[in-house]
């Protein structure tokens, strides 16, 4: 196994002696009659005995009140309540628009002049790039900066949208200067002016024509909302919970005197090994996959599609005349304990691509989301027709794959991609629905798993329905896979992060039976900037430095560790089936790190490190810097937006944040209003039943409510021509990530019912082949036409 560490001594091995308690596993369920708590001696049971996976939303409660039972089908069961109805619960944030009248009318000549200046600005960038390209100003391949640029790669459509957005923003800046608008109101006052009435009218996105009776999603998510067909579409702007705080009101980053450097803020984050003994690393992996499904904010590239270099190869600043206008490098202090030893004072960072405003008005900048906003499995299938078609086999509804040794199936390989690390083992890149498929091995494993399952189901459906052609097999299988991704997210993943109480408040709990009727075309399913840039990056705290490789189901044959910092953008190790299956076992037993302000070195100091460098980038500093690039207001403003009283002093944060983090930030920030949202996310006390804090959970719950109630194709919705039948929906509700892993692994035969939680008496080891891990009944998809 290439690059896998040698087997460590006994003292370094994780203690997993409890996971195979054979007496317990021989009698996985204690037997006897099911027993569930009742409301009283003569009253019916409060809870129902169900197969364990149907009680996933209440797993945290079951850990402390282990109400197990034997389900009616003889499988391991648990006692939990039914959910019969749910209500829509989005748009909780107060109206915060600062749309104000302009101080005077703008003349046609002034408008023309502003547009001319904007176009000249783009031409100046083009001239700079021509000169820079002749001087080879681009990150060298196999550097951390190059890998980071590949992660934030802008597609051709994304680049085109970005340059259109840039012209609109530069014209807005010129108009704001002409009108002498204060930064607080500049981005709002200009929204009275329409781009369509200028020479920039071509940047406005047209509305697609929709077929309201279509049975399947479009490739780019257009027409999901018939009333607003561009909502949620790929290459659209992110939504905002609160207006941005740009320094100039238009696009200048959130930077002003008194704000601490992000390097200094990042240094309050430490690498302390503090595992969460209840949650597995699957929580982090799944969250990353979902993040890549609903959002991809690219960074600007040159007009000829080259990555932009902002620092020298050894981490120094470029001279001003050689620095690209779209660079926004991170300043690293000379006394930085880690980077100082290498003389690094500059980290590459390029500004995020901005999109033309949806309303085609002038005003402040909104960043581009290159992926579809809906939770539609686009991470597997792609967010554009071009990508989706490139991944298909066009036979039997299957996806393209690579087959090694006759039976080992992995993702297709693109020999033309150059963004994977090249060393003695690597160089070959996988391709998938999302550009970041090769980012790290745990994520790539999930990509392989889902493509395997798609092809397995497509083959089975072709036997059940011999008359179905390739297109129907592909679309029906994709529809099933998308439903499974949604169900696992809402039934298993979100309860482990948000807890059942908050999910109930936001109408996020899956129903026990029947349909939901909460689809609302007025709900904008767009991903919010705050979710993408800060709140959903909570998972970076869960990352661990290495993966443990267990070579068989006895968990006695240990294959060593796979260190994250050694395998960024290098999927070559997954060409070995032993490693692939070992990583699946790790996802069942490996614990996540505790959610707090501690983050491992693999991402804090070695992000995207290549074999040719001694250091990588700093993910924490990058997250903070990205928030300022996007003009994200401070944490305190979101505290108020989420219904709490805004803090007047740092000590007012103590009921919400851990004291240690409050003490650190009060010496860094001059004002409590300045505290960056992301560092606030890391410092919060957890809400009841969840692992994240009140502001983080507020932003996340609102987002997932939007992704449910704003998605016409959401798997539980009834009353639509494309809705699943009641029997099909019930079978989908019986599914779990455990079953998905059982179906797609090669040598994993034992698993726990809920792989988001570590093995325990309420989450026992069970065989993949038994009743305890229900299968999807594909016979329910047998068609008469």
What is each of the regions a protein language model found here?
Residues 33, 54-58, 447:
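Intrinsically disordered, low-complexity regulatory segments
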Residues 440-452:
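Alpha-helical bundle segments that constitute or directly flank the non-heme di-iron/ferroxidase center
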Residues 63-68:
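Short, recurring structural edge motifs at helix starts
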Residues 3, 9-41, 45-48, 52, ...:
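Terminal regions of secretory-pathway proteins
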Residues 451-455, 632:
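Hydrophobic faces of stable alpha-helices that mediate helix-helix packing
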